From Swiss-Prot:
One Gene Ontology term of the molecular function aspect: structural constituent of ribosome
Entry keywords, A to Z: Ribonucleoprotein, Ribosomal protein, RNA-binding, rRNA-binding
Keyword Transcription regulation applies: no
Record protein name field: Large ribosomal subunit protein uL24
GO cellular component: ribonucleoprotein complex; ribosome
GO biological process entries: translation
Protein family (similarity comment): Belongs to the universal ribosomal protein uL24 family.
Organism: Borrelia duttonii (strain Ly)
Stretch forming the signal peptide: none
Superkingdom as given in the UniProt entry: Bacteria
Amino acid sequence: MKTKLRVGDKVKILCGKDRGKVGEIASIDRKKFKVTVKSCNMIKKVIKARTPQEKGKIIDKEAPMDISNVMLFSNGVISRVGIKFENNEKKRYLKKSGENV
């Protein structure tokens, strides 16, 4: 499956515990069809102490979510992404509003 989303795109989360939140894509795993959105879908990660003198920690970390659970967001509207050619260059655009991404 091919995706038209890119790192740095502003997306809205469609389902899950963070439904309705807007964030920026931090990373995309194209083989597993997962995206990581900054400060969304946070989980607690336990880090063990490496030496007896150190203490273990619990940190907050973004967990990846399925790519179908996010949609491109711009000017208060979520939309699918299309591709058109202008001057022999591929341009991404929002299908609802027609504006370039």
